[in-house]
Design a protein with these regions (language model features):
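Conserved alpha/beta catalytic core and glycan-binding cleft of carbohydrate-active enzymes
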Residues: 1-75, 111, 118-120, 130, ...
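Aromatic- and carboxylate-lined catalytic core of secreted/periplasmic carbohydrate-active enzymes
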Residues: 8, 72-76, 80-117
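Active-site rim elements
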Residues: 32-40, 79-87, 172-173
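Short hydrophobic/aromatic beta-strand or adjacent loop that forms the aromatic wall/cage
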Residues: 121-123, 133, 179-184
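Active-site beta-strand termini and strand-to-loop segments that position acidic
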Residues: 126-131, 187
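Short hydrophobic beta-strand that contains or immediately precedes a catalytic carboxylate
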Residues: 138
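Beta-strand-rich binding/interaction modules
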Residues: 144-165
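C-terminal beta-strand-rich structural cap/linker in extracellular carbohydrate-active enzymes
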Residues: 170-187
């Protein structure tokens, strides 16, 4: 997957302790390349936003109003007020930000291991770990349903899905992930 090439390139180009800034949009992107809700509309936004919050050696960038369905580009050089009130993505971002804040597995210095979980052209999965704290992230970066199968037996067990707030059994059994789907599990 091209994303791995980009990560590998940053591993080579930057010092080992350098932090990357990941984002789905920002003020400049919104101004020049359309509003966040246009470039990654609806469900398409979520797996990429999950990545920005859970990737190795990273700092996520969330810009003003990203939790709001702001449907137009922001003026760049003039004051442009963002009217808030709907907060369509508020719960989604609250879960991610809370997890990042309280779980040491998402610290900048926590380990990162890519995991095979299905069609690698569409599914990107990885484990972040720091001591006994471990987080499994599975992302469907496609508009098609994907079959998920975890081959790494060390990841099997009853684990907590932070978005459903339920315990799920992860095993060799296959399951389906909806288009643009995502799952984040805490061990």
């Amino acid at each position: 997957m091209d994303f791995d090439s980009a990560l590998n390139r940053t591993d080579k180009d930057f010092p080992a302790n350098a932090l990357r800034m990941f984002f789905t949009s920002n003020h400049d992107e919104n101004t020049w390349n359309k509003a966040d809700y246009e470039t990654t509309p609806g469900a398409k936004h979520a797996p990429f936003a999950v990545m920005t919050q859970t990737m190795k050696r990273s700092i996520p960038l969330i810009y003003s109003g990203q939790e709001e369905p702001f449907l137009r580009a922001i003026r760049f050089f003039d004051k442009d007020t963002i009217t808030l009130g709907n907060y369509q993505r508020e719960n989604f971002y609250s879960v991610l930000l809370h997890l990042r804040k309280v779980n040491p597995a998402l610290a900048a210095n926590a380990s990162f291991k890519k995991v095979t979980a299905g069609n690698e052209d569409a599914v990107y999965a990885y484990v972040r770990q720091n001591g006994k704290n471990k987080v499994l992230v599975i992302l469907n970066w496609s508009d098609k349903e994907q079959t998920i199968k975890i081959a790494d037996k060390t990841l099997y067990g009853n684990i907590h899905n932070v978005f459903t707030n339920n315990t799920q059994n992860v095993s060799a059994k296959e399951w389906k992930m909806k288009p643009w789907g995502y799952a984040v599990y805490v061990y």
